Amino acid sequence: MEDFVRQCFNPMIVELAEKAMKEYGEDLKIETNKFAAICTHLEVCFMYSDFHFINEQGESIIVELGDPNALLKHRFEIIEGRDRTMAWTVVNSICNTTGAEKPKFLPDLYDYKENRFIEIGVTRREVHIYYLEKANKIKSEKTHIHIFSFTGEEMATKADYTLDEESRARIKTRLFTIRQEMASRGLWDSFRQSERGEETIEERFEITGTMRKLADQSLPPNFSCLENFRAYVDGFEPNGYIEGKLSQMSKEVNARIEPFLKTTPRPLRLPDGPPCSQRSKFLLMDALKLSIEDPSHEGEGIPLYDAIKCMRTFFGWKEPNIVKPHEKGINPNYLLSWKQLLAELQDIENEGKIPKTKNMKKTSQLKWALGENMAPEKVDFDDCKDVSDLKQYDSDEPELRSLSSWIQNEFNKACELTDSIWIELDEIGEDVAPIEHIASMRRNYFTAEVSHCRATEYIMKGVYINTALLNASCAAMDDFQLIPMISKCRTKEGRRKTNLYGFIIKGRSHLRNDTDVVNFVSMEFSLTDPRLEPHKWEKYCVLEIGDMLLRSALGQVSRPMFLYVRTNGTSKIKMKWGMEMRRCLLQSLQQIESMIEAESSVKEKDMTKEFFENKSETWPIGESPKGVEEGSIGKVCRTLLAKSVFNSLYASPQLEGFSAESRKLLLIVQALRDNLEPGTFDLGGLYEAVEECLINDPWVLLNASWFNSFLTHALR
């Protein structure tokens, strides 16, 4: 039979059939009848489409080969014969441009004249039996069915045969010829008898031998063999069954499974209120660095030495003054804290010998800023259980905050490239196995795309600050230790660079439990005027501390330099995770790898090189009010990294809850897009669970806004 197929059919058809069988894990040397059936079906699909065009007036015309008008639009789009991913892409494209309903199963053709998908069937049995099987499988009135047999019979939906008599006769003649050729070689009987009913992929796999015995032994109770269980599963109606089971559980439970349709979901309700404020542990897009290139000073690498060297690069210091007070704080204390820091650094310089660490004097302003002696005294419960009015503190409900544009700007900035390199390629030994070679190639490509990214700077900054703060918290528990906020990078030319963002002063830190809090005051340099977005800086007291000369197109311009000061706190567990922010690189690399794997499995070869080097291709990045945003593979890498970094920087119970609950809603919407007819009960309860996490967190509110954009475009 295999030889006959290769002689009888066009080599292109044979090649497509081989690919299709390979895709479903079938061996054409064994399944020779299936090989012949696939080739026959492909040929009928191609013949159905041949010579049929649509002219400029939108009329269907037949044009024989060699005709000069052959540049007309093809009447039929051929879907059969393409690999699954490409075929679904074509189907989705047709649905988007024509408004046709998306079919559940891949059809064979699309008819641009009648605006409908067509399912072609070729049967060795009775046409009406095969027609009913097809209709039963597809369950869609929108897809047109047309069945041909090897005996010259045909059957089509509503007896609408689509094509003219002559075109259909050509197909019937070809099928009759194939039958005659098979019969003359003694192949027809086997081929005719081998046809099974319309089958799904799962049914094609025959289980025999040991696996069959294991299958029969592994059934749920009350099933004697695999066939009985399969029959039960095929006839299973999940929605009704779940309703029935729930009603048996309790009289109070009454869940009706409601169909989830395009019109069912509503947008998430974002809270009203004043705009949300910045709550990260350090400044992001607004940070300013004082930097030294090619550091080679004495004590290079010791934070305090590096910090003093960076401070010396700036000459524009001036008498500080408050430009944006903190509404609830004692603002002069913040001002005095900065003045104290400058004075104590000056003392170090005057002494000439710089110590490795610096503990600040415990002044009244620092004691206030670090909450010294502010914690209520702890009393043993046994000593006060007789107190009649003993009760827990009344805690206020958190104030609702609305989404503000600054958080989207922060995210956009995190995705951008800087002019510095923040991570090096790992120095890893020679690859031993091919898989290691592919892995290190992917890692190197990915690193090249993200090494200049601002999100990578945030990772290195976060790792440094959390490591330094945790070390100081353990090594100098009672001291108000000064911790410079430092990062290191390379310039594009490869020169080393040390950057100072500002300082942290740590409070008392007797951290016994993971969640015990250490207070700290952060003082960070910036060129951002806080009066432009005062709501963003609600938690900060901002000082003007100097003037910085900047090079611009107009020559040198002077800009005021600000110091953003605030009291903050963290815990051992938060610092531990902050120290491990490099994991964000790994997480986003794994997401990119899964995209490469999907592409590679379709193409049947490793696509890493093509994936990163094909600069013309664009990929979906995310949803915005405009629709699906697309960008280069580098932009995708940086966006995924920025999302992972922001999940770390803005980690909170609100984010945990929103991620877990919105994921359920997302899966239901995905099921709807995949035509899986999802059903839900208590959808209102799910919305409630999602929306109770939308309180005041800027990152959660932004994600909720993205989710609404996704809903809008996914359900068009």
Curated annotation (Swiss-Prot):
What organism is the protein native to? Influenza A virus (strain A/USA:Iowa/1943 H1N1)
Q: Where is this motif: Nuclear localization signal 2 (NLS2)?
A: 184-247
Q: What is its main location?
A: host cell
Gene of this entry = PA
Q: List the Pfam families.
A: Flu_PA (PF00603)
Specify the protein name.
Answer: Polymerase acidic protein
Per the UniProt record, which EC number(s) apply here? Answer: 3.1.-.-
Residues involved in Mn(2+) 2 binding? 80, 108
Binding residue positions for Mn(2+) 1 = 41, 108, 119-120
Q: Which domain of life is it from?
A: Viruses
> Motif Nuclear localization signal 1 (NLS1): residue span?
124-139
**Which family is it part of?**
Belongs to the influenza viruses PA family.
Per its UniProt record, the required cofactor names are:
Mn(2+)
Description of post-translational modifications = Phosphorylated on serines and threonines by host kinases, including human casein kinase II.
Q: Which InterPro entries match?
A: INFV_PA (IPR037534), PA/PA-X (IPR001009), PA/PA-X_sf (IPR038372)
Instruction: Tell me where it resides.
Output: Host cytoplasm; Host nucleus
Any one GO molecular function term: endonuclease activity
Keywords on this record? Cap snatching, Endonuclease, Eukaryotic host gene expression shutoff by virus, Eukaryotic host transcription shutoff by virus, Host cytoplasm, Host gene expression shutoff by virus, Host nucleus, Host-virus interaction, Hydrolase, Inhibition of host RNA polymerase II by virus, Manganese, Metal-binding, Nuclease, Phosphoprotein
Q: What does this protein do?
A: Plays an essential role in viral RNA transcription and replication by forming the heterotrimeric polymerase complex together with PB1 and PB2 subunits. The complex transcribes viral mRNAs by using a unique mechanism called cap-snatching. It consists in the hijacking and cleavage of host capped pre-mRNAs. These short capped RNAs are then used as primers for viral mRNAs. The PB2 subunit is responsible for the binding of the 5' cap of cellular pre-mRNAs which are subsequently cleaved after 10-13 nucleotides by the PA subunit that carries the endonuclease activity.
